[in-house]
Each structure stands twice: as structure tokens, then as C-alpha cells.
Amino acid sequence: MSNKGQLLQDPFLNALRKEHVPVSIYLVNGIKLQGNIESFDQYVVLLRNTVTQMVYKHAISTVVPARPVNFHPDAEASS
């Protein structure tokens, strides 16, 4: 994964995690998962609902927050 991708993903996912924002995660096969982001790294997201699920990023299509979230990507990410 490129560094530029991480410059956008990390601040967004971290804001969702820190603010405990509920999210809907849609997978590439159409399945919808819901919960709170507990943690993440370069390859996976830990999603907590009644249990914690490890979701591989390559299987994720879309992450939809339940409410707007403020995050500050590096200026380089917007170029």
C-alpha cells in the first residue's frame, strides 16, 4: 500500500476510533458490518459490536460513519 493512501486512511480511521463513532462497513461482496473501530493497521480493521471482528482492508469497499467526523489529513494527501 502506498504511503499516500496511509496519509488519508490513518487520520480518518483514527478519528472514528477516538470519537467512538459507529460505522457501517460494506465489503466488496455486499455484506454490511456495523460496529465501532477498535483498532487498525496497514492490513486489517478490528470492528467491535457484540464481538470483535478482524476485517481485512482488501475486502472493504466503503466505510460509512453514522455521523460526520472531523479529521485532518496531511496536506500532501489532498494533492
UniProtKB/Swiss-Prot annotation:
Molecular functions per Gene Ontology: RNA binding
Coiled-coil boundaries: none
Gene3D superfamilies referenced in this protein's UniProt entry, alphabetically: 2.30.30.100
Record-level GO BP terms: regulation of DNA-templated transcription; regulation of RNA stability; regulation of translation, ncRNA-mediated
Residue stretches spanning the membrane: none
Top-level division of the source organism's lineage: Bacteria
Keyword tags: RNA-binding, Stress response
GO cellular component: cytosol
Domain Sm: 10-69
Oligomeric and partner information: Homohexamer.
Family: Belongs to the Hfq family.
HAMAP family referenced in this protein's UniProt entry, alphabetically: Hfq
Known function: RNA chaperone that binds small regulatory RNA (sRNAs) and mRNAs to facilitate mRNA translational regulation in response to envelope stress, environmental stress and changes in metabolite concentrations. Also binds with high specificity to tRNAs.
UniProt protein name: RNA-binding protein Hfq
Species assigned in the record: Burkholderia multivorans (strain ATCC 17616 / 249)
